[in-house]
């Protein structure tokens, strides 16, 4: 049996990879251990968040599936950091985990060019460092020249609950052990990481009256441009799967509340008294865990001065019969989990439905990858998701999409899609991984991006949909609508930049009615709109041309006006960076004479002999600081 592309693993990375490949015309096979669990949310019942919301909207802009599914499975929608600037705001949705999984599985089953097989991949087949196929536990051999591995925590997964250990990829699911050995046999550098999850509790046993209420936003904002622009069309396709649309096809989800409680000194004492039974401290766990999502025992150990920690109580489904306790990830023994949980306000009589646990798993050092997510050593082998050292559904989905796109582009003999750091958070994510590597689970933050004002959630669709359209994942009619809206926004911005208001009596009265500050000299409308007291809806009162602008378009215009000069500064920085990267490296340059470069970087530059600074920047381990040093030296060298 032969396929153009084979994907191993049906999690968030695998879904995006196989959908992108199949939709781009490649005959695709998804091999997954348990078909019913395609799209399962292994940990928290939420999509998005700070920087993660950016990733979801970028995935959507490129033609991925995560945003659409989130809109139809969402049961609470919130914008985080709303009081801060638009660059760091993040969209987050609680999801019905069952609805999300069922929706994703149905999408895959109804996608042309895509087959699904429930098997365990055991061996990667190669010939002369070229992928030739994959073998499964059933003895089946599937031939392909392009293989995408998206195994998540299943790669040699080992679960810990106290001193108890269990080989598994998730509770109740087989791990992928032989595949890990097959990767090692290919000579790939590998390591061991760890993550964890919290107890899930029966809603009937929670005292909600003792908890703080956390509602969603009054107005829910969808993740996908398809939900915003083409809701009627999508609602017809998914009418039996989602209740998030009203009778007119408008996005109007019923939002279910979350709750907040806190640990206390008694909780901490119980956990401290059982440190000697915690696999995290006894040496039982060897993998490195996520710095920014530590277990409760790790938090109490590292932050001994804290007298309490937040616990976010989140429904797992629309029925809200079971709750996820965000903040209580643990690998402590079951009896200790019960004891410390009963010390938390509102959970004195709580019954655990599913215990918390830690899981260790193998990963491949991401410096083994090209920016296309193809491995350097094996042609046609792509890796995406937690196997590359990341943590999070959104980070995984972003990598899966890029791997699927690039495998399909390779079939078409086209150059891979490589997003720059100034173009997308996806570009930042992949560049960080392949150039710097990681020794701990990597998660995305807005602080990782140098050009945050250019990479906002609200402009993701305008930044990246051109790529999605070019490769065939964004349909013509979708791109036409996106282009129309982009042109409409630019038209509005140009009007505000080019039209001046004079400080006469009539205009001053108009400014007062708009709540804007008075002016004493001729001023562009852009500066007026960019004032701190101006709101998006007031733009409609400036000129009749704005009457038909949508709320989203006005909001985008407001942001561009408020941060206009800072945005221009970042655009200038990007232009300078592009010019710098185009700088040619003289062939006679002796890298060993450049002070400030490490021996490792000098060795790599000598090995690959890059013709330009851009080519040098693509070499794994060559840092931005090294590129700056090279640039300065080249200018001095040419001036001699």
From Swiss-Prot:
Its cofactor is FAD. One of its GO terms (cellular component) is cytosol. SUPFAM superfamilies: FAD/NAD(P)-binding domain. It is found in: Cytoplasm. Its main location: cytoplasm. It holds the Pfam family GIDA_C_1st. NAD-binding protein involved in the addition of a carboxymethylaminomethyl (cmnm) group at the wobble position (U34) of certain tRNAs, forming tRNA-cmnm(5)s(2)U34. Belongs to the MnmG family. This is tRNA uridine 5-carboxymethylaminomethyl modification enzyme MnmG. The gene is mnmG.
């Amino acid at each position: 049996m032969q396929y153009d592309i084979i994907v191993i693993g049906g999690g968030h990375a695998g879904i995006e990879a196989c959908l992108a490949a199949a939709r781009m015309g490649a005959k695709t096979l998804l091999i997954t251990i348990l078909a019913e669990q395609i799209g399962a949310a292994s940990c928290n019942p939420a999509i998005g968040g700070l920087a993660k919301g950016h990733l979801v909207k970028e995935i959507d802009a490129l033609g991925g599936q995560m945003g659409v599914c989130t809109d139809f499975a969402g049961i609470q929608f919130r914008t985080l950091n709303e009081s801060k600037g638009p660059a760091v705001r993040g969209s987050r949705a609680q999801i019905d985990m069952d609805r999300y999984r069922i929706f994703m599985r149905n999408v895959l089953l109804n996608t042309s060019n895509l087959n699904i097989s429930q098997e365990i991949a055991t061996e990667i087949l190669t010939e002369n460092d070229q992928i030739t196929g994959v073998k499964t536990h059933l003895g089946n051999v599937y031939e392909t020249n392009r293989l995408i591995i998206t195994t998540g925590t299943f790669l040699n997964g080992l679960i810990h609950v106290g001193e108890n250990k269990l080989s598994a990829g998730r509770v109740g699911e087989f791990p992928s052990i032989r595949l890990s050995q097959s990767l090692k046999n290919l000579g790939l550098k590998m390591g061991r990481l760890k993550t964890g999850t919290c107890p899930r509790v029966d809603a009937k046993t929670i005292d909600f009256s003792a908890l703080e209420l956390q509602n969603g936003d009054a107005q829910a904002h969808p993740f996908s441009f398809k939900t915003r622009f083409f809701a009627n069309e999508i609602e017809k396709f998914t009418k039996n799967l989602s209740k998030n649309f009203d009778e007119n096809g408008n996005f109007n989800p019923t939002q279910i509340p979350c709750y907040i409680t806190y640990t206390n000194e008694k909780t901490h004492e119980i956990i401290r008294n059982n440190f000697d039974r915690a696999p995290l401290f006894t040496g039982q766990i060897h993998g490195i865990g996520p710095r920014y999502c530590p277990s409760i025992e790790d938090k109490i150990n590292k932050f001994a001065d804290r007298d309490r920690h937040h616990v976010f109580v989140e429904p797992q489904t629309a029925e809200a019969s079971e709750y996820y306790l965000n903040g209580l990830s643990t690998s402590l023994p079951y009896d200790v989990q019960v004891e410390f949980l009963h010390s938390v306000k509102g959970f004195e009589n709580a019954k655990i439905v599913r215990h918390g646990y830690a899981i260790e798993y193998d990963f491949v050092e991401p410096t083994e990858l090209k920016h296309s997510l193809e491995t350097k050593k094996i042609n046609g082998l792509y890796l995406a998701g937690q196997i590359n050292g990341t943590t999070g559904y959104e980070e995984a989905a972003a990598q899966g999409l890029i791997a699927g796109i690039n495998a399909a582009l390779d079939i078409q003999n086209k150059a891979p899609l490589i997003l720059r750091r100034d173009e997308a958070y996806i570009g930042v994510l992949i560049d960080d991984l392949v150039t710097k590597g990681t020794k701990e689970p990597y998660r995305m933050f807005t602080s990782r991006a140098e050009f945050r004002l250019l990479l906002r959630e609200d402009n993701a669709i305008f930044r990246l949909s051109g790529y999605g359209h070019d490769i065939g994942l964004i349909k013509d009619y979708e791109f036409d609508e996106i282009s129309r809206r982009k042109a409409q926004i630019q038209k509005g911005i140009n009007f505000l930049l080019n039209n001046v208001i004079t400080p006469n009596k009539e205009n001053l009265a108009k400014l007062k009615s708009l709540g804007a500050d008075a002016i004493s000299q001729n001023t562009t409308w852009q500066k007026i709109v960019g004032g701190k007291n101006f709101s998006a809806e007031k733009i409609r009162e400036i000129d009749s041309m704005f009457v038909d602008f949508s709320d989203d378009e006005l909001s985008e215009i407001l942001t561009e006006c408020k941060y206009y000069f800072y945005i221009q500064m970042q655009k200038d920085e990007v232009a300078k960076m592009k010019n710098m990267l185009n700088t040619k490296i003289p062939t006679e340059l002796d890298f060993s004479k450049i002070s400030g470069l490490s021996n490792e970087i000098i060795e790599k530059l000598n090995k690959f002999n890059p013709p330009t600074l851009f080519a040098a920047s693509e070499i794994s381990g060559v840092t931005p600081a090294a590129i700056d040093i090279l640039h300065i030296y080249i200018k001095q060298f040419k001036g001699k």
